[in-house]
Every structure is written in structure tokens, then in C-alpha cells.
């Protein structure tokens, strides 16, 4: 079996790691960075990912997509999506199935399709390092992701050409990376994961028995729409408001200006983790009829903290719930681990330390721990790591809608996965021949307030008085946290396997089409790279040949010179076209025409080398100094 890589598909940044021996190793990308910006840009005929995409965002804001993870597996009408529509420079549109999609360069795309571009870069990064094709991956998701979001993440992996061996929760992955080589017996850890777009808290117990470690998640909670992007947006709004007060101009109507403000706000936020104040200075940020306008706003750490205090406070509520669900108090927690870039903010660190009554560990890299843990899980699945057992949980309860619009739970939240649960239901009316089973995920008693995962009809029920037919519904929750449902009519013994067709999400046909498009693009990218290489080779050949012709001078016969000039001219024409084979053929033709030239160049080089040797010898002779010696007599010694 080939290597199974671990990928942290983040809102702001992504990271890829692989098990190197018995230790996880983060792999640097082509730009030499250990993390890759989760930014995708569509330009004329090219798709950019990572830093190259980020660099051109100011001049191409409407076609530069970021924080796509906030949309993955979400419906267009979701409150969180509607909030994002107000602040994102790119278009968020409603798909035919009601999902939140994006639009760039006039083309509508699903969130998994866009995220697949980041995964493709992660895959390529790993392949370049390993020197072999990679097909298997463990991809991390926020612990509080629901079924639709997990399924959409798996879809993104499939579109990127990866077989997703396992979906693993981010805090659990961080705990794996942290606890793998820790000695000293059992411990109960709290992983506080505040990333670019999502927040999770997981309480995890690490037990060690005879060298085998068990990582058991006791409880998890979180908020899938709280993260560094929200902190950025608070600062962006403050800067825009200050500018409006001073200049009377609303920058929100100017996408180019807003992109510059966004970048400046991100930079200022990071700086304020290490300094008490910073200046946001943007010359020529916009202009009106009178003159160009410049932004110059001083921001203190105290000001930033006042802008985001409620966001930090919002992250503390799930901590209380998770501890209560695990039936623990803060005194039972032995270690606190901070994961996610936003945890570098001093205020976040202070509030978490205050809550748990202890400082967080400093020996965990918040940007890399999740990918490293995913790589460890990849090693477990590949059979390379044998002394680790991971027991994760489902973050939300699962059930169905029953009479009166009530949600009846079959699987309670924080149940260890994989798991199976069943319950017998019946009909609500006499002689009912079919029932609609509406599958839900969430904690509310009222069905309408929970997440709808889809519904299906079970037909062919034999006519009988209400309450008589017995329909056994089975929920099968796999290790990825994804739900499969089956139903059985107990009277007839006939069983039906049912795949939930959620009202949203991508169909198999849509995914297959996107996979084929990705493959086609891969082929096109490969051809483009080969053509660029051929053109570069042609350029070097033309330049080198002309230089040699000049150096050969009269030593090159006129007939050969004409042949070479004709071949150079033909190669220049071929280089302008898109036919790699034609360029290669003309390069070969020029090499053939230049044989005499090569001989002359070689002779000249040999003559030059010989002349250089003679000069060196002469120079050595010139360095000899004549001196008079006096014989030393023995008695003078």
C-alpha cells in the first residue's frame, strides 16, 4: 500500500504531512512554505492556488476565492451564508439544489469543487516530496461539522483525485500529534481549536496500557462559523468606518480598496499579537473628484481586543458544555492544547488560561499539529502504526421527525463512532401504505430547528390499522461520521437499504463530471508546462547559436551560416505557435544545421584552453626571483 497522507484543509491555510519512519513530517510546498494559503484565483486560462493566488487578489478581487470552507456543505439560505454574502468580494450564488455555490469568471462552482483545487496542490506537494503518486489521504474537518459538511469534504477529495480513507476531527488529530510520543501515563486533555473559520473544543482521554495508547474523545462542541475571518472582519469594519468618518467615502462599494483593507487588517491583527500598537497605512486607497485619498489609522491592541471581545467570549460557552457532557470539571484537565492560528492572539490565550486555571502547552505548533495528527492516522490505516487506537465521537445527535413535528433521537451526541442504532416506528393513519422518514441532525426537540439531512419514502406497507405495522429504522454511523440508513418492514421481513438523497449536496454524476474536468485540466496543465519548457529550450538554443555564430566569425563557411540562419528563423516561427512537437522538430533541425558550428566552437575552446595553459606556465616562470645564497659553514650553525 502506498503512503496515506494527512491533510489539514483549513479555512485560511492548509497543511500536508506524511509519516516519515515513525514520526509525522510536514511537507513544504513548491514555494518553500510549510502551510499553503487556502486561496484560489481564476485568471484568464489559469487557476492559481496558495500564495500566487493571494498575491494577485488586489487586482482580481471578484475572481479570488477564500474561506470557501465556510460554505462547504451549506445551504444558500443559511443565516451564516447570508452574513458572508454581505462581506465577501466574490459572488455567492444559489445552486439549483439550494446549496451555496460561488461564481468566478462567469462560471458557477460548488464549494467542494473549489476546495478540490487546494487538495490538488496538497497532493502534488506530497508527490513531489515522496517521488511517487499519492492516492490515499486522511482529511481533517472541524469536530462540529455536520453530515452534509463531512460528505462535501469527502466529495472535494474525490474531485481532487484522492481516495479519502478517513475523515478525522481536527482537535482529535491535534491530540494524536501531541500525545503520540508523550510518556507519563494517562492524561485528560482539552483541545481548543480556533482556526480561520471554525471553532472546536474536544475533551480527550489518553490511556496507555502496555505501550498501546488509546485516544478516546469524551465530548466535543463548537461553532462552525466562528474563526479568524470573523476577527478580521471586525477590524476591517472598524478601519472602513474610521475612513468614512474622516473622508466621507464608503470603501465597501469599492472591491479593489476592500481587498487592500482586508490584507492590511490581517497584517495588523498578526502584528498586534507581538506589539501594543500598529499603523494601518494605505496610500491611494481610493479617490474622489478632488484628489486621491489615503488611509492612515492607528490601531492599538486594546482597541482590537474591544472589537473582538464578544467573539472570544462566544468561544468559552462550548467549553462549559463539553466539560458537562464529559462529566468533568476544569480540575480534571491535565493539559490544554491550543490549535489554529487565531490562538496566537494574547487575549485568546489569557481567556483560555483563565477558564481552565492553567496555561496552555507551548510545545504544539498551532498551524501544523492537525496535519501531523492526520498523518499519524494515515499511518494507523496503512498498518505502519500499530500501537494507537482512536475512538472519536459524533458531535451532534441524529434522529427522525415523528408525529407533531418532534425530533426523536436514535444516536445521541458524543456517541463513540462507528455505531449502529435502531428503533421501531409505525404508521400514523389507518391503511397507510407508505411512510416518509425525515432524517435530522441537531439538539432541538422541534424538528424544524434541526439540520435536515434528507428524507425518503418507504412504500409497499401492507394495509393495517394505525400503529400496527412495525418499521425498524437503523442508523449506521461510520468512522467518518457519515450516516447510512436502512429500513425493514418487520411483518414481511423484507429489508430495504436506503441511501438518503439529501436535498442538497452533489450527486454522483456531478462529482464524476467534476473529477473528469479536474483530470482534463490536469492534462491541459501538463501540456502547458511541457509547451513552456519547449519554448524555453528553443529560446536558449536560439540565443546560444547566435552567440556562437558571432564568435566563429569567418571560420564558419557562408553556406553553413545560411543554413543555420534559416533553421533559427524556422525555430522562431515554431516557438510562437502552440505545437510542442513542431518546436522539438525545429530544435532538432537547428542542431543538425549547427554541426559545423559546434566543431568550430569546440576547436576554438580547445585552442583557448591551450593558450591559457601556456600563459600560466610563462607567468609561473616570471614569478621566479633570483637571489644570492651564502653557504652556511658548520661552525656558524
Swiss-Prot record:
CDD domains: ASKHA_NBD_HSP70_DnaK-like. Gene3D superfamilies: 1.20.1270.10, 3.30.420.40, Actin, Chain A, domain 4, Substrate Binding Domain Of DNAk, Chain A, domain 1. This is Chaperone protein DnaK. It comes from Vibrio proteolyticus (Aeromonas proteolytica). The keyword GTP-binding does not apply. Induction: By stress conditions e.g. heat shock. It holds the Pfam family HSP70. The gene is dnaK. Belongs to the heat shock protein 70 family. The modification Phosphothreonine is found at residue 198. InterPro entries: ATPase_NBD, Chaperone_DnaK, Heat_shock_70_CS, HSP70_C_sf, HSP70_peptide-bd_sf, Hsp_70_fam. Residues 606-616 have a biased composition (Low complexity). Residues 606-637 are annotated as: Disordered. GO terms for molecular function: ATP binding; ATP-dependent protein folding chaperone; unfolded protein binding.
